[in-house]
Amino acid sequence: MPKIYRIVGETTTGMKFKIEVTAEKPYDAIEKVYSLIGSRHKLSRVQIKIREVTAVQPEEARSDSVKMLMAIDRVIKY
């Protein structure tokens, strides 16, 4: 069952971020953040500094998209 992780960090360009993602392990959540920030802002991994990774309860999540993903109890593939 995936968990919700809140990742806090900043980039070398001075941009601070706080992102919530779903992942199985903290390492997977960090990889997802590297991918998201890197593709959105054209930054390499060296330019992204992760400061904090915390597991968050679904009730504490701020992102609506993450809340909706966690509400899904099954996926049917045709």
Swiss-Prot record:
GO BP annotation list: translation
Domain of life: Archaea
Alphabetically ordered keywords of this record: Ribonucleoprotein, Ribosomal protein, RNA-binding, rRNA-binding
SUPFAM superfamilies: RplX-like
GO MF, any single term: large ribosomal subunit rRNA binding
Pfam families: Ribosomal_L18A
Gene Ontology annotations for the cellular component aspect, listed alphabetically: ribonucleoprotein complex; ribosome
UniProt xrefs under HAMAP family: Ribosomal_eL20
Subunit and interaction comment: Part of the 50S ribosomal subunit. Binds 23S rRNA.
Family statement drawn from the similarity comment of this UniProt entry: Belongs to the eukaryotic ribosomal protein eL20 family.
Protein name: Large ribosomal subunit protein eL20
Gene designation: rpl18a
